[in-house]
Amino acid sequence: MSFLKKSLFLVLFLGFVSFSICEEEKREDEEEENEREENKESEEKRNQEERPPGFTPFRVD
């Protein structure tokens, strides 16, 4: 019986550790994705500021 308890404890502990590692990696991936989106947005804003005021890329006849 003691062997089963120790085995169960070990399995649960290793599962918890692997779950924690996966969650940490997921969080890091989300942070990197957010940084990429922010960089993309800031780059778009910089590109928009280079245009003169009232400029439209569409031709109006």
From Swiss-Prot:
<dbReference type="GO" id="GO:0005576">
    <property type="term" value="C:extracellular region"/>
</dbReference>
<dbReference type="Pfam" id="PF03032">
    <property type="entry name" value="FSAP_sig_propep"/>
</dbReference>
<feature type="compositionally biased region" description="Acidic residues">
    <location>
        <begin position="26"/>
        <end position="36"/>
    </location>
</feature>
<comment type="similarity">
    <text>Belongs to the frog skin active peptide (FSAP) family. Bradykinin-related peptide subfamily.</text>
</comment>
<keyword id="KW-0800">Toxin</keyword>
<dbReference type="GO" id="GO:0006952">
    <property type="term" value="P:defense response"/>
</dbReference>
<protein>
    <recommendedName>
        <fullName>[Thr6]-bradykinyl-Val,Asp</fullName>
    </recommendedName>
</protein>
<keyword id="KW-0840">Vasodilator</keyword>
<feature type="region of interest" description="Disordered">
    <location>
        <begin position="24"/>
        <end position="61"/>
    </location>
</feature>
<feature type="compositionally biased region" description="Basic and acidic residues">
    <location>
        <begin position="37"/>
        <end position="52"/>
    </location>
</feature>
<keyword id="KW-0878">Amphibian defense peptide</keyword>
<dbReference type="GO" id="GO:0042311">
    <property type="term" value="P:vasodilation"/>
</dbReference>
<comment type="function">
    <text>[Hyp3,Thr6]-bradykinin: Induces relaxation of rat smooth muscle from tail artery (EC(50)=56.7 nM) and contraction of that from ileum (EC(50)=588 nM), urinary bladder (EC(50)=4.6 uM) and uterus (EC(50)=3.9 nM). Binds to both bradykinin receptor B1 (BDKRB1) and B2 (BDKRB2). In arterial smooth muscle, the effect via BDKRB1 is stronger, in uterus, ileum and urinary bladder the effect via BDKRB2.</text>
</comment>
<keyword id="KW-0732">Signal</keyword>
<comment type="function">
    <text>[Hyp3,Thr6]-bradykinyl-Val,Asp: Induces relaxation of rat smooth muscle from tail artery (EC(50)=3.5 nM) and contraction of that from ileum (EC(50)=223 nM), urinary bladder (EC(50)=1.5 uM) and uterus (EC(50)=356 nM). Binds to both bradykinin receptor B1 (BDKRB1) and B2 (BDKRB2); the effects via BDKRB2 are stronger.</text>
</comment>
<dbReference type="GO" id="GO:0090729">
    <property type="term" value="F:toxin activity"/>
</dbReference>
<feature type="propeptide">
    <location>
        <begin position="23"/>
        <end position="50"/>
    </location>
</feature>
<keyword id="KW-1213">G-protein coupled receptor impairing toxin</keyword>
<keyword id="KW-0964">Secreted</keyword>
<dbReference type="InterPro" id="IPR004275">
    <property type="entry name" value="Frog_antimicrobial_propeptide"/>
</dbReference>
<feature type="modified residue" description="4-hydroxyproline; in form [Hyp3,Thr6]-bradykinyl-Val,Asp and [Hyp3,Thr6]-bradykinin">
    <location>
        <position position="53"/>
    </location>
</feature>
<keyword id="KW-0838">Vasoactive</keyword>
<keyword id="KW-0379">Hydroxylation</keyword>
<feature type="signal peptide">
    <location>
        <begin position="1"/>
        <end position="22"/>
    </location>
</feature>
